[in-house]
A protein has these predicted regions:
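Short, glycine-rich nucleotide/cofactor-binding loops
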Residues: 3-13, 211-219
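A short, Lys/Arg-enriched amphipathic alpha-helix followed by its capping loop at the start of a domain
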Residues: 19-28, 228-232
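Donor-nucleotide binding loops and adjacent catalytic segments primarily
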Residues: 44, 181-277
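Conserved nucleotide-sugar phosphate-binding/catalytic loop shared by glycosyltransferases and other
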Residues: 28-69
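Structural motif
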Residues: 2, 87-88, 205, 279-280
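Active-site and donor-binding regions of nucleotide-sugar-utilizing enzymes
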Residues: 4-7, 13-22, 46, 58-157
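A nucleotide-sugar donor-handling region in carbohydrate enzymes
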Residues: 37, 41, 138-216
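A donor-sugar binding/catalytic signature common to diverse glycosyltransferases
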Residues: 91-92, 142, 272-299
Length: 299
């Protein structure tokens, strides 16, 4: 059996690795990277360190408006599907890559496997919610992480091909968290790249991320969030999302922050380490919230 797997963001590579290790024992897999998220951390070191298969195809789509990005992905994915003629197409989660892969396969009648099906926020302003609902509607096999996800699909009259298989993110976090203790704390702090000044090691910390448009597009919200970070009883390690960097830099020109360690986005294992050992995590990321639960870190 031949499966074409579509991924476009770093978390999807991590999740796909957990499944690919099993698939490739018995089946042929073609791994397609849409290029949705260009990440300097996704070098050969990223794939080697995490034992992740390197992509067989990189479409190199890059950033753009939602419509343009999704359309360009669909064109590239369709070319791959017509060439490879797979038995199934597999997609993960709720990114534009997910939707593009599902639509491209559906149009040429290739069955679709959706991993992490059935998740709902019930906020239709979120692009992720739109992507996951549309992908579920045209998928053949819907692999749900929880019984709640199964029930969500039932409410939408989707019952065929639905299975509760457990959470692949949990598999990935548990697998990679075992690798963290191979290095001392100093090793991970040496990897932190300060945006405005060098970063020194600290004994305890909070880990914070902000990336949702509801927060990043409003300078007053960012100002209030950073003010709250300043009041915490330990330093806040804050990997700054590219979307947030301009506003953060502007606010730093207005006010000196003493309790916040502004750092560049970090690699997956580094991030996992700082989440696992944080006093608490503060985030608007659904994925990170789930990781904190798995790692037993307050959030």
């Amino acid at each position: 059996m031949k499966i074409v797997t579509i991924v476009g963001a770093r978390p999807q590579f991590v999740k796909a690795a957990a499944v690919s290790r099993v698939i490739r024992k018995k089946h042929e897999e073609i791994l397609v990277h849409t290029g949705q998220h260009y990440d300097n951390n996704m070098s050969d070191v990223f794939f080697d360190e995490l034992h992740i298969p390197k992509p067989d195809v990189n479409l190199g789509v890059g950033s753009g408006t939602h419509a343009r990005q999704t359309a360009e992905m669909m064109i590239g994915i369709e070319d791959v599907l017509l060439k490879e003629k797979p038995d199934y197409l597999m997609v993960y989660g709720d990114t534009n890559s997910t939707l593009a892969g599902a639509i491209a396969a559906s149009k040429i009648h290739i069955p679709i496997i959706h991993v992490e099906a059935g998740l709902r926020s019930y906020n239709m302003r979120m692009p992720e919610e739109q992507n996951r609902i549309l992908t579920d509607r045209i998928s053949t096999l819907l692999l749900c992480p929880t019984e709640v996800a199964v029930e969500n699909l039932k409410k939408e009259a989707i019952t065929e091909g639905v299975y509760n298989v457990g959470d692949v993110m949990c598999d990935a976090v548990l697998y990679y968290s075992k690798m963290l203790e191979e290095h001392p704390k100093k090793f991970y702090f040496e990897h932190l790249e300060g945006i405005y000044e060098p970063i020194d090691s600290v004994d305890e910390w909070y880990l914070a991320t902000i990336h949702r448009a509801e927060n990043t597009d409003d300078i007053d919200k960012i100002r209030n969030i950073l003010a709250a970070f300043e009041e915490l009883d330990a330093p806040v390690i804050f990997p700054v999302h590219p979307r947030t960097k301009g506003l953060v830099t502007k606010l730093r020109d207005e006010h000196k922050y003493f309790n916040i360690l502004f750092v560049q986005p970090m690699g997956y294992l580094d991030m996992l380490y700082f989440v696992k050992h944080a006093k608490k995590a503060v985030t608007d990321s659904g994925g990170l919230q789930k990781e904190t639960y798995i790692l037993d870190t307050p959030c």
